[in-house]
């Protein structure tokens, strides 16, 4: 069972690799669901990690209805990821009706020629996931990341099971959202998904002297709480599938 860990900083990338992760999804700002990471993070992760790295291609948070400028931005980001040596990219685009935007996806996949392509959880907003799955297969996507159109992958386990049965090995189904050591084994037993995706997040407190009168952005966020990958969660999940 391959385990993909999504990360948004170099500390987490190293923890994930050293804890047994099989692949990294390199993102910016996981608190927003993940956006395109900076050039410097992509390059540094690729320089110091020796497991496959897929780069998130998402120009902003919010919906997956992109304008012409954003499409060009995504194409450029894919070219950068390719030039830096990434093994794959993570994409997704929908129409106003909640269908896979075939035109945009064709452009992005063409830009990614030679790289692996994962379609991200925009899939969980599809109006018809079963038709959408066939479209992703036709597009040539390597895998789709999905929670089975539910809040968590465990809640969507029976939809995931149906998607796996429909896919018949033509595309990998990777379950993500709320995956943890307490539900991973049961999730896989029921759904038979090919891979698991998780952030395995924890946090450490900053050692920097603070100023409680100032916040840097969202007031609900603690600027002195540093989110990182929890090695114990990864080790525990890997162990589940080795027994």
Swiss-Prot record:
The organism's superkingdom is given as Bacteria
Molecular-function annotations in GO:
copper ion binding
Q: What is its main location?
A: cytoplasm
User: Where found?
Assistant: Cytoplasm
**SUPFAM superfamilies per record:** CutC-like (SSF110395)
One Gene Ontology cellular component annotation held by this UniProt entry: cytoplasm
Q: What Pfam families has UniProt attached to this entry?
A: CutC
- Keywords carried by this UniProt record: Cytoplasm
Protein name (database record): PF03932 family protein CutC
User: Which source organism does the UniProt entry give?
Assistant: Histophilus somni (strain 2336) (Haemophilus somnus)
> Species lineage, top-down?
Bacteria, Pseudomonadati, Pseudomonadota, Gammaproteobacteria, Pasteurellales
The gene it comes from is: cutC
């Amino acid at each position: 069972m391959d385990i993909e860990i999504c990360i948004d900083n170099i500390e987490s990338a190293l923890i994930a690799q050293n804890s047994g992760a099989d692949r990294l999804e390199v993102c910016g700002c996981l608190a927003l669901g993940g956006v395109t990471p900076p050039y410097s993070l992509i390059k540094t992760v690729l320089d110091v990690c020796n497991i496959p790295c897929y780069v998130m291609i998402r120009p902003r948070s919010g919906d997956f209805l992109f304008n012409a400028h954003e499409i060009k931005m995504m194409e450029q980001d894919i070219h950068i990821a390719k030039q830096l040596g990434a093994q794959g990219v993570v994409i997704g685009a929908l129409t106003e009706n909640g269908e896979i935007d075939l035109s945009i996806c064709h452009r992005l996949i063409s830009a990614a020629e030679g790289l692996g392509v994962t379609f991200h959880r925009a899939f969980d907003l599809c109006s018809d996931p079963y038709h959408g799955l066939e479209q992703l297969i036709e597009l040539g996507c390597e895998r789709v990341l999905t929670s089975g159109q539910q809040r968590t992958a465990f809640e969507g386990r029976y939809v995931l099971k149906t998607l796996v049965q429909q896919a018949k090995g033509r595309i990998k189904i990777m379950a993500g959202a709320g995956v943890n050591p307490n539900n991973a084994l049961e999730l896989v037993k029921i759904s038979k998904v090919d891979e698991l995706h998780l952030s395995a997040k924890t946090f450490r407190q900053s050692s920097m002297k603070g100023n409680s009168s100032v916040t840097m952005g969202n007031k609900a966020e603690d600027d002195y709480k540093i989110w990182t990958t929890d090695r114990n969660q990864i080790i525990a999940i890997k162990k589940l599938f080795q027994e």
